[in-house]
Curated annotation (Swiss-Prot):
The gene is pyrC. GO terms for molecular function: dihydroorotase activity; zinc ion binding. NCBIfam families: pyrC_dimer. Catalyzes the reversible cyclization of carbamoyl aspartate to dihydroorotate. Binds 2 Zn(2+) ions per subunit. This is Dihydroorotase. The keyword Transferase does not apply. InterPro entries: Amidohydro-rel, DHOdimr, Dihydroorotase_CS, Metal_Hydrolase. Zn(2+) 2 binds at residues 100, 137, 175. The modification N6-carboxylysine is found at residue 100. It comes from Pseudomonas fluorescens (strain Pf0-1). Homodimer. It catalyses: (S)-dihydroorotate + H2O = N-carbamoyl-L-aspartate + H(+). Zn(2+) 1 binds at residues 14, 16, 100, 248. Substrate binds at residues 16-18, 42, 137, 220, 252, 264.
Length: 348
């Protein structure tokens, strides 16, 4: 087994950078590895139109490290009030690459999300016509639904209906966590893809709950049982072009995670490709990592792959116990633990 792995520079097709002073930290972490990233729009207030997306984009560009060529790919936040014309304007901008459907209340800063998918059918029609992908946080939010069943029920009640009603609409099932989602994506048309996080490949709910509650494993969609973890590993390492890298790296300050009512999100951007390499190595599938990390996403979005390269080496190192997050700190996933792969260098 080789101790060195060179890949076309990957992209992150789902990340949260937050806003304000913390951008200096979060942008540096993502730009270290990735050429581009799909930037989640769930700010307060959310990114609802092309003008707001451009403002956020300029703040991200200003936070890039000196010499960085990292490109943020912006996303609109869909609400019950989004208009088809706003989709057409966003598409014409050239820098908005998708729109995100958050069911109201599904995750961090989703209170402004869509209350009923039927309300945005005219918007979805405009997206299909414009060729703009729809990114879906696929969980129902009703109080009578068990948190571990939210994804499966969303598939049955909503996903099937959306892809049948809009067969030409490109749909990304974001951060899938279940074998049910893997099966749905595999059986759907080529217009349906999915992102998978490193933490859902590496961990299951036992890691979060057995022997004490570990708040830094808490995310939404929540970690599932190990059989679902295995299904995700099968999908990611299958070679199927339908599945691609999306970290869902979602930082919260330490005090907001280590609390009586802690926030959902795992911070992985600081070592994302290293974590994915560990997951693929578990399956003896490092030869499949480049397609998953560097090729499948651009192909789905109709963008060229990056041409420069990164190199990973098998060289154990210890993850930091904390990282700066503006004036506060964030505890990264695997804080203080050993990682097996290290990012070495880039090639022109």
């Amino acid at each position: 087994m080789s101790d060195r792995l060179t890949l076309l520079r990957p992209d992150d097709w789902h990340i949260h950078l937050r806003d304000g002073a913390v951008l200096t930290n979060t942008v540096a972490d993502v730009a270290r590895t990735f050429g581009r990233a799909i930037i989640m729009p769930n700010l307060v207030p959310p990114v609802r139109n092309a003008a707001e997306a451009d403002g956020y984009r300029q703040r991200i560009l200003a936070a890039r490290p000196a010499g960085s060529r990292f490109e943020p790919l912006m996303v609109l936040y869909l609400t019950d009030r989004t208009q088809p014309e706003e989709i057409r304007e966003a598409k014409a901008s050239g820098f908005v690459h998708a729109a995100k459907l958050y069911p109201a209340g599904a995750t961090t800063n989703s209170d402004s999300g869509v209350t009923s998918i039927d309300k945005i059918f005219p918007v979805l029609e405009a997206m299909a016509e414009a060729g703009m992908p729809l990114l879906i946080h696929g969980e129902v939010t009703r109080g009578d639904v068990d948190v571990f069943d939210r994804e499966k029920i969303f598939i049955d009640e909503h996903m099937r209906r959306v892809v049948e009603r809009f067969p030409t609409l490109k749909v990304v099932f974001e951060h899938i966590t279940t074998g049910d989602a893997v099966q749905f994506v595999n059986e759907a048309s080529a217009n349906v893809g999915a992102t998978i996080t490193a933490h859902h490949l590496l961990y299951n709910r036992n890691h979060m709950l057995v022997g004490g509650i570990r708040p830094h494993f808490y995310c939404l969609p929540i970690l599932k049982r190990n059989t679902h973890q295995e299904a995700l590993l099968d999908a990611a390492t299958s070679g199927s072009a339908k599945f691609f890298l999306g970290t869902d790296s979602a930082p919260h300050a330490q005090h907001a995670k280590e609390a009586a009512c802690g926030c959902a999100g795992c911070y992985t951007a600081y070592a994302a490709i290293e974590l994915y390499a560990e997951a693929f190595e578990q399956r003896n599938a490092l030869d499949k990592l480049e397609a998953f990390a560097s090729l499948n996403g651009p192909r789905f979005y109709g963008l060229p792959a990056n041409t420069d390269r990164i190199t990973l080496v098998r060289d154990e190192w210890t993850a930091p116990t904390s990282l700066p997050f503006g004036e506060l700190t964030v505890i990264p996933l695997r804080a203080g633990e050993k990682l097996r792969w290290r990012l070495l260098e880039e090639h022109a």
